[in-house]
Regions:
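Extreme N-terminal, non-catalytic leader segments
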Residues: 1-22, 26, 37, 43-52
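NTP-dependent small-molecule kinase module
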Residues: 2-12, 41, 202-205, 251-337
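Intrinsically disordered, low-complexity acidic Ser/Thr-rich regulatory segments
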Residues: 10-17, 128-153, 229-246, 250, ...
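Conserved lysine of the Walker
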Residues: 31
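Conserved nucleotide-sensing/catalytic segment adjacent to the nucleotide-binding pocket
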Residues: 52-55, 59-124
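Conformational switch/transducer regions in large eukaryotic molecular machines and scaffolds
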Residues: 110-150, 163-166, 171, 175, ...
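ATP-dependent NMP and nucleoside kinases share a basic, alpha-helical "lid"
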Residues: 131-212
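Acidic, metal/cofactor-coordinating or nucleic-acid-engaging core segments within structured domains
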Residues: 206-279
Length: 337
């Protein structure tokens, strides 16, 4: 490539481009851990590369607006694992703001780091080695990210409900405005037994707290609202003081796992050897049958526009991290060519 061609190519790049990496999967599958590891890897590569994390948990509705549901055993509990508990319009607007400005909106103050952080399972030596490998690879691809040039932003956006089915299969979906703003979609499957064990060992979660009275008109709306409310993203966060949620007994089997299977029925496949026709029928009606057919929930489609982590949830986090780095590198390498 001549110097003139390189200048033309550089001028064609978007100013301060933003790449959003979506990381999703069931509860306790390692989403937050992976996001933090990727942040550590990529945040020290170059002054021209800015990185930060977004957490879907920061978009929960206030505690007193979380919907209630009645379980099969007759218990009435709050359902924190449904899309109706998430302020989807606020989440989509915040994501749009990030893509436009390359930073989090002032309104968004994260509470996720107040939750307990578990050991990542990846040594400092491995992280340092991966940092060197990423830096060397980017140097081979082009000078923009490692030398003088325009800044690029990479956002690691993690959450349990980020993706939507292919538009050819489901024309309208509540998460489509979020899904379409994510450039790289990573999915971490995890078996039911693992999810249940990890989730039930957690002490609980920091929550947003109850809504102010009267409710503020610009801080959120439920996913089912007919009219999308305006969200002033430049305003300071006016969320109330945090509360703390602890799962009641049986919450994984009553709420967490059935909701995960229901909301990802478009992505999950029947457990090996089970009837696919029965699965397709159950997707539209019987959640108990759907959960039974999915089994451990580690068979996942690879043709739905989502990159699925190898190993069906059984690989060490170090191996998942290496896979994720390769996926993150793809758009960065393409941008430099």
């Amino acid at each position: 490539m001549t110097e003139a061609e390189a200048e033309v190519k550089a001028s064609a790049r978007p100013k301060n481009p933003v790449t959003v990496i979506g990381i999703s999967g069931p509860s306790s599958s390692g989403k937050t851990t992976l996001a933090r590891l990727l942040q550590r890897i990529f945040s020290h590569i170059s002054e021209n590369l800015q990185t930060f994390i977004m957490h879907e948990d920061d978009f929960y509705l206030p505690d007193d607006r979380i919907p209630y549901t009645t379980t099969s055993s007759g218990k009435t509990v709050q359902d924190w694992d449904t899309v109706e508990a998430i302020d989807v319009p606020f989440m989509a607007s915040a994501l749009s703001y990030v893509r436009q400005h390359g930073r989090l909106p002032p309104r968004l103050k994260s509470k996720e780091d107040l939750n307990e952080a578990s050991d990542s399972g990846v040594s400092d030596e491995t992280i340092a080695q991966l940092q060197r490998q990423v830096s060397e690879k980017l140097q081979q691809v082009g000078p923009v990210l490692v030398g003088d040039g325009e800044k690029r932003t990479v956002v690691f956006f993690e959450g349990f409900l980020l993706f939507s089915p292919p538009e050819a299969e489901v024309r309208e979906h509540v998460l489509r405005p979020v899904h379409e703003q994510i450039d790289v979609r990573l999915f971490l499957p995890a078996p039911y037994d693992y999810v249940k064990n990890r989730r039930e060992r957690r002490s609980g979660y920091v929550t947003i707290g109850p809504a102010p009275v009267p409710p503020l008109p610009h801080r959120g709306s439920s996913a089912s609202d007919d009219v999308k409310q305006h969200v002033d993203l430049e305003a300071e966060d006016d969320a109330p003081p945090q509360n703390f949620w602890t799962d009641p007994p049986g919450y994984v089997d009553d709420i967490v796992w059935p909701r995960y299977v229901r909301d990802h029925a478009w992505l999950l496949l029947p457990e090996s050897g089970l009837d696919n026709d029965r699965y397709q029928n159950a997707r539209n009606s019987d959640i108990d049958e759907l959960v039974r057919i999915v089994g451990q929930g580690t068979n996942v489609r690879t043709d739905a526009g989502v990159a699925v982590a190898p190993g069906k949830g059984a690989l060490p986090m170090a191996d998942v991290l290496k896979w994720a780095i390769e996926e993150v590198m793809k758009p960065l390498e393409m941008a430099e060519r």
